[in-house]
A protein has these predicted regions:
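Basic/aromatic-rich interaction segments and small domains that mediate binding to polyanionic partners
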Residues: 2-81
């Protein structure tokens, strides 16, 4: 498997989010669940959005291994915190 639970990721392509919203390439997130057959991942993501009170729009999406890369910055944060 490409990733494991709690790995940080960065999307390589835009993917469909919920409510007809598009999650842009470059969006970062965290793996919540991993599936083996077929390989897939549930990822919690946050997208900057000035229209939201928090400044972010949150979504939980399904991604395939070819749609993301491991975010080394997130891994370093976890190791050094």
């Amino acid at each position: 498997m490409k990733a494991k639970t709690d790995d940080g990721i960065r999307l390589l392509v835009a993917v469909a989010g919920h409510y007809e919203k598009i999650v842009p390439a470059g969006t970062r997130g965290v793996v919540l669940e991993c599936y083996n057959n077929p390989e897939g991942y549930i990822v919690d993501i946050s997208i900057p959005d000035p229209n939201e009170l928090s400044g972010y729009r949150y979504d939980c999406i399904e991604v395939a291994p070819e749609q993301f890369e491991i975010n080394q910055e997130r891994l370093n944060e976890l190791v050094h915190s």
